[in-house]
A protein has these predicted regions:
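Sec-dependent N-terminal signal peptides of Gram-positive bacterial secreted proteins and lipoproteins
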Residues: 6-27, 395-411
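Short stretches within intrinsically disordered, low-complexity N-terminal or propeptide regions
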Residues: 17, 30-31, 328, 351, ...
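N-terminal secretory signal peptides that target proteins for export/translocation
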Residues: 1-5
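Phosphate-group recognition and catalysis centered on beta-loop-alpha active-site segments
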Residues: 11-14, 27-314
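Beta-rich interaction/scaffold domains
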Residues: 313-393, 397-399, 403-416
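Cytoplasmic C-terminal tails of single-pass
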Residues: 414-434
C-alpha cells in the first residue's frame, strides 16, 4: 500500500512537470518573438522623436560576414547592433520584389556553374534568379562565391524577425507592391519606405492608405532642400535623406536643419563621401555631421558608430549631472561677473543638451561648465558640508566686524550710564550732608 502510494505520488509529480514543461517552451518562443517586436517598436518610437537619440543604419547589412542585401547580412547587422538596415530593392520580370542594389547582376551573382551572370534583373524571372549564388561582401570578381541566394523582400522581413527596422530604397516606383508586402508580413510599423517623389505625390499616396506607412523623403532629385524638407515633412514623412557633394552646401547649414525641429529626422548616408560633403564614415565624420544636426546615420561601420554613440550618451549624462549641480549653486555672495559667467554657461549647456548630438560639443560644454563652477572659488567644504567661498568668507568677516563695532558702542554707552549714575549719586550724597 505504501509502495503504491509512493508510485502514484511520483507519477503525479511527473505528470505535473510535463504539463508545465510544454507551455514553458511555448512561452519561450512567444517571448523571443515579442522581444523582436518590442525592439523594433522601441526603435520606431525613438525615431519619431525629432530630438531623440542617434540612430544607427547599416548599409546593406553586415557585409563583413555575408553578401550585401542578403537575408543573412540583414539579420547579422541587427545582431551587431544596427537599429535599421538599409536595403535596395528591384523587381523581377514576373513581378517579385527582391533585394539587390544594381539593375545588372554581374557584380553580385554567379550561376550554378560559377559563371558571372551578365543580365538585367528586370529580364529575369524569380525561378531563374533563385538559382543564382551571391558573391561575398560587396561582390565583384575577386570575391568568393557563397551559398547565399537573392532574397525576396518578404523573406528578408521574415529572416530579420523584428530585431531591427528596414529602410527600403529604390522602390518608390512600385511602392504599392511594397506596401502590400509589408502589410502581408505585418511589417508596416517596422519598415520605412524611401520616397523620391515631391510633396504632392507623397501626400496623395499616404492619404490613399488605410494604415499609414512610414516614409522618409529623399532630396537628391528635388531641387531646393529647405523647401523640400519642409513640404515633405508636412506631408507626413518622418524624416528626409539629404545629400550633397559640396561640404558647404545648404543641407549642412542651419537654414535647412531648422526645418527638422519638432517635425522629423535629418538622415545622411556616410558610406560614400561624394554624397555627404566629402566626409568619411569614421568618428571624425560622424562628429562633424552630428554637430550639424543629422541624427540618423547610414554607415558601414556598425560597431564603430555604436561606440561613438555610447560616448555621446556618456557625455550627455555627465553634462546633465553637472548642469543640475550648477543650477543648484548659490551665487548670491559671489561677484557679479563670476555669477553672470556661470549663468551664461548654464544657458549654453542647456542649448547644447537640447540640440546637439556631437561628441566634441557635449564634451566642450561640460568642460566650460566645470570651469565656470571652479571659478566661483577655490572651493572647500567645512565639517558640516557647507561650501566655503571668498564671498562667504568676506561676509563672515563683515559680520564679525559689525559685532565688534556693536560691542564697542554698547560698552561705551554702558560706561557712560555707569558714570552718570555715579555722578548723580555723588551729588545726592553731598546734599544729604548739608
Amino acid at each position: 500500500m505504501k509502495k503504491s502510494f509512493t508510485k502514484q505520488l511520483i507519477s503525479l509529480i511527473l505528470a505535473v512537470c510535463f504539463t508545465l514543461a510544454f507551455p514553458a517552451f511555448s512561452f519561450a518562443a512567444d517571448s523571443n518573438q515579442s522581444d523582436g517586436e518590442a525592439k523594433s517598436e522601441s526603435i520606431y518610437n525613438e525615431f519619431k522623436k525629432s530630438d531623440g537619440e542617434l540612430i544607427c543604419v547599416s548599409k546593406y547589412g553586415d557585409t563583413d560576414k555575408f553578401p550585401e542585401n542578403s537575408a543573412e547580412a540583414v539579420a547579422a547587422a541587427a545582431e551587431k547592433g544596427a537599429d535599421i538596415v538599409y536595403v535596395s530593392v528591384k523587381k523581377t520580370s514576373d513581378g517579385y520584389v527582391v533585394l539587390m542594389a544594381d539593375s545588372n547582376l554581374s557584380r553580385m551573382c554567379v550561376d550554378e556553374l560559377g559563371n558571372t551572370v551578365n543580365k538585367n534583373i528586370g529580364d529575369v524571372g524569380y525561378h531563374e534568379l533563385s538559382s543564382y549564388h551571391l558573391r561575398a561582401g560587396t561582390g565583384s570578381l575577386h570575391e568568393p562565391i557563397t551559398s547565399c541566394k537573392i532574397p525576396t523582400l518578404a523573406e528578408a522581413i521574415q529572416y530579420l524577425g523584428g530585431n531591427a527596422m528596414l529602410m527600403i530604397a529604390d522602390g518608390w516606383e512600385y511602392r504599392d507592391e511594397i506596401y502590400d508586402i509589408l502589410a502581408g508580413e505585418n511589417a508596416l510599423s517596422n519598415s520605412i519606405i524611401l520616397a523620391t517623389g515631391d510633396k504632392k505625390e507623397i501626400s496623395s499616396w499616404l492619404a490613399s492608405k488605410t494604415v499609414m506607412p512610414l516614409v522618409i523623403s529623399s532630396s537628391a532629385k528635388n531641387g531646393n532642400a529647405k523647401s523640400y524638407v519642409s513640404k515633405t515633412l508636412s506631408a507626413g514623412c518622418i524624416g528626409t535623406l539629404l545629400s550633397a557633394k559640396n561640404p558647404y552646401n545648404s543641407v549642412f547649414k542651419d537654414g535647412v536643419q531648422s526645418k527638422f525641429k519638432d517635425a522629423g529626422r535629418a538622415v545622411i548616408d556616410m558610406t560614400n563621401s561624394d554624397i555627404c560633403g566629402g566626409r568619411e564614415d569614421n568618428p571624425t565624420g560622424w562628429n562633424d555631421i552630428t554637430k550639424r544636426g543629422f541624427s540618423v546615420i547610414i554607415t558601414n561601420d556598425i560597431e564603430g558608430f555604436n561606440a561613438y554613440r555610447a560616448r555621446v550618451k556618456s557625455y550627455k549624462t555627465s553634462l546633465t549631472s553637472d548642469l543640475e549641480k550648477a543650477q543648484a549653486t548659490d551665487t548670491a555672495l559671489c561677484s557679479t561677473s563670476i555669477a553672470n559667467k556661470l549663468k551664461k554657461t548654464i544657458t549654453e549647456a542647456k542649448s547644447t543638451l537640447s540640440s546637439s548630438m556631437s561628441e566634441t560639443e557635449l564634451m566642450e560644454a561640460d568642460y566650460s561648465l566645470r570651469l565656470a563652477m571652479e571659478a566661483l572659488a577655490d572651493r572647500t567644504e567645512n565639517d558640516n558640508g557647507k561650501t566655503v567661498t571668498p564671498g562667504r568668507i568676506t561676509a563672515v568677516v563683515l559680520v564679525v566686524i559689525a559685532l565688534i563695532i556693536f560691542e564697542i558702542v554698547f560698552d561705551t554707552l554702558r560706561r557712560k550710564k555707569v558714570s552718570k549714575r555715579r555722578t548723580e549719586n555723588g551729588r545726592a550724597h553731598s546734599s544729604g550732608k548739608k
